[in-house]
Regions:
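Short, Gly/Pro- and small/polar-rich lid/capping loops
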Residues: 1-15
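Metal-dependent enolase-superfamily TIM-barrel catalytic cores that perform enediolate-based chemistry
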Residues: 115, 119-172
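Structured core elements
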Residues: 13-15, 25, 159-161
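A generic structural signal for short
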Residues: 2, 80-82, 136-138
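Metal- or metallocofactor-binding catalytic centers and their adjacent structured scaffolds
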Residues: 17-99
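Short alpha-helical segments and helix-capping/turn motifs at coil-helix boundaries
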Residues: 91, 103-104, 144-148
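A generic local secondary-structure boundary/capping motif
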Residues: 2-4, 106-108, 149-151
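N-terminal amphipathic alpha-helix/helix-capping segment at the start of soluble metabolic enzymes
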Residues: 68, 98, 102-116
Length: 172
């Protein structure tokens, strides 16, 4: 995720802890493009926990998922609400897997593959190395894009997504 000034997001990590000490983790984010929603999103997360999950059996993730969907989406599902539902759903499945001492994929029918592809973004403005040059608007310098792409493939990424649209406030 790019820095906030480039249009990135604010991440929220959800930690659910059961009365038996099991911990489940989930995550969600709100895009900074939604402007000013950071604090209200945090309140939505807290309120959703209180309304739909607090005091409920975490070993019933499907029941709780449908409870959240019915209670949060009403007639219209949106990005923010489904991000919250997804974060709690992930945390609940994490708890179930720990309770039964098995990976979640076993609970969902077994492993489908033994590895997955990972991709990354290349935004219009890139830092070539930890202390290195920052390149703005690589669309004007394709050799920079080629060099960075090769480095990312060497790091293990098998897919690259190029975003030439300026992300910085000053237009790149």
């Amino acid at each position: 995720t790019p820095p906030p000034q480039w249009g990135g997001g604010t991440w929220y990590f959800i930690k659910l802890e059961t009365d038996t000490g099991l911990v489940g983790w989930g995550e969600t984010a709100v895009l900074n493009a939604f402007g000013g929603m950071t604090e209200s999103y945090k309140l939505m997360i807290q309120e959703s926990f209180s309304r739909f999950l607090e005091g409920k059996n975490p070993l019933e993730p499907e029941t709780l998922y449908h409870r959240m969907v019915r209670g949060l989406t009403h007639q219209h599902a949106d990005y923010a609400r489904f991000g919250i539902i997804s974060a709690f759903d992930t945390a609940l499945w994490d708890i179930v897997g720990k309770h039964y001492n098995t990976p979640v994929y076993n609970l969902l029918g077994g492993a489908y593959r033994d590895r997955i592809r990972s991709y990354t973004y290349i935004y219009d403005t890139v830092k070539m190395s930890a202390g290195g040059e920052t390149i703005r608007n690589w669309t004007q310098r394709p050799e920079v894009l080629a060099e960075l792409s090769a480095r990312l493939v060497d790091e293990g990424f098998t897919g690259l997504k190029f975003d030439p649209i300026p992300q910085s406030k000053d237009g790149g």
